[in-house]
Amino acid sequence: MISRVTYQGDLRTEAVHIQSGDVIVTDAPIDNNGKGDAFAPSDLVATSVASCMLTIMGIVSKRDNINIVGTTAEVEKTMSSSPRMIESITIKLFFKSKLSDKEKKKLERAAKTCPVEASLNEKIKKKVEFFFHN
C-alpha cells in the first residue's frame, strides 16, 4: 500500500503517504462545487506530470553530472465540461543552469520518457516547452 485516502467531508480528502507520513489535502475546484482551498485531484494529475519529468531529468543529470538544481516547471491544466475530464496539460520547464546543446537534448529526451505522462488518456492534449538559460 502506498497511501491511505480519507474523505473529510465538504468535498475534501486527506491522503497520507504510508512510508513517510506526508499528507496531501485535496479540495474540489470552485467550478465544481468546491472551495478551491487546495489542489483538486485533477490538479495533482497535471502537477504529477511535471514532477515526474523533473525527477526523470534529475536521474539523468545525477548520472551524467549535469546541474539542473533550481529548474522549475509551470503547470497549466484545462478541463472539458462534457464529459468532465482533463482536456489539456501544458508544462513549461525553466532551466537556471547554462547547459550545452548536448545536455539540453539529453534532458529533453529524458523529460519525454515520463511514465506518468505516458499513462494519461490519449485524448488529453499535452504540450511541453523548454526554456533554457542563455
Feature roles, as predicted:
Residues 1-47, 58-134:
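Extended beta-strand/beta-hairpin segments
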Residues 55:
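Short glycine/serine/threonine-rich phosphate/pyrophosphate-binding segments
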